[in-house]
UniProtKB/Swiss-Prot annotation:
Organism of origin: Lawsonia intracellularis (strain PHE/MN1-00)
Location within or outside the cell: Cytoplasm
Pfam families: tRNA_Me_trans, tRNA_Me_trans_C, tRNA_Me_trans_M
UniProt keyword Disulfide bond present: yes
GO molecular function: ATP binding; tRNA binding; tRNA-uridine 2-sulfurtransferase activity
Official protein name in the record: tRNA-specific 2-thiouridylase MnmA
Keyword annotations from UniProtKB, A to Z: ATP-binding, Cytoplasm, Disulfide bond, Nucleotide-binding, RNA-binding, Transferase, tRNA processing, tRNA-binding
Keyword ATP-binding: yes
NCBIfam families associated with the record: PRK00143.1 (NF001138), trmU (TIGR00420)
Binding site for ATP: 6-13, 116
Residue span of region Interaction with tRNA: 139-141, 294-295
PANTHER family per the UniProt record, alphabetical: MITOCHONDRIAL TRNA-SPECIFIC 2-THIOURIDYLASE 1, TRNA 5-METHYLAMINOMETHYL-2-THIOURIDYLATE -METHYLTRANSFERASE
Cystine pairs: 92-189
Family statement: Belongs to the MnmA/TRMU family.
Amino acid sequence: MNVAVAVSGGTDSLYTLATLREAFGNHHVFALHARFKEQITNDPVPALKEQCHNLNVPLHVVDLHKEFNELIIRPFIKAYADGKTPNPCVHCNAKVKFGLLQKKAQELGANQIATGHYVSLIDHDLYGKALKCGADSTKDQSYFLALTPREQLQTAIFPLGTLRKTEVRERLQKMGLEVPLPKESQEICFVPNDDYRKFLQSSDVDLLSEGRMVMLDGTLVGKHKGLWKYTEGQRRGLGVSWSEPLYVAHKNHSCNELVLGTAKDILVDTCTAQDINFLVPQDNWPKELFVRTRYRQQAVPADIQFVTNTSSSKKITIHFHSPQLPAAPGQLAAIFDKSGYVLAGGLITNDL
């Protein structure tokens, strides 16, 4: 068995490489680094080469910046222009890390690919090989893998699933390994300083400018600075003085209007999602289901209704057991069981 370890230059992937090299030996493990940018500052490759030399494992570097631009960056920009709030990490996992990079690993002779995601892949009696939340709830990345096809995860290895971040750092220190990029990666890797507004403004896509900001009953309360700068459920940065805290209820893209409401007024009990990716066959789902529509959100109880439509992709309606803040179209809805196994994922729509 040969294992390719996807390495970025950070703590998690370096530990993954070191621990698998120890488990399988240097003749069955190699490192694989993908370049996602044409021009790179603080290039980790020289330091990665040194660490791979110390571990006596080969390092392969592949240039995927053109593919990354077409598959991730351009759709990210277009989604904002269309009034959505995309999650590029979800698509990167599905199309790049467990898509293009996995294919490259196979071409180089790997049977399996390992990453530093904080998740576990467990043989379940009913589900088969199933994805489960990481033990470190502050780092758990199961949400971001809910759109990755089941078959692409079957040959994955996730050594960090049972560990906490502090343990990973301590173990690396004991191994005497120095992290090439000691600083934690930013929220969106291709957006400088996590300033997505500045990034979008520098793009070549037309973005809606300022427009009316109204309450749910139509009362005009001000002007917004462009719908793409706001997301459903947002509270901070609205620039409106009101007797109660206001939140974004929804964005009316057709007339460039931002609709606000108080917390109790904007709560919803349903949302819809499409392009459903099944990580566990629906027939094997338990009765108790839980849904997350945001990364940092705790999964909440919900019922799932499958909607029959004429399109080839499946669509679902999510019925929350208790009212929730509105979910942003373009974000991911991930479905879990009560033990933290990921059952499916889909993209949230603005259908009612």
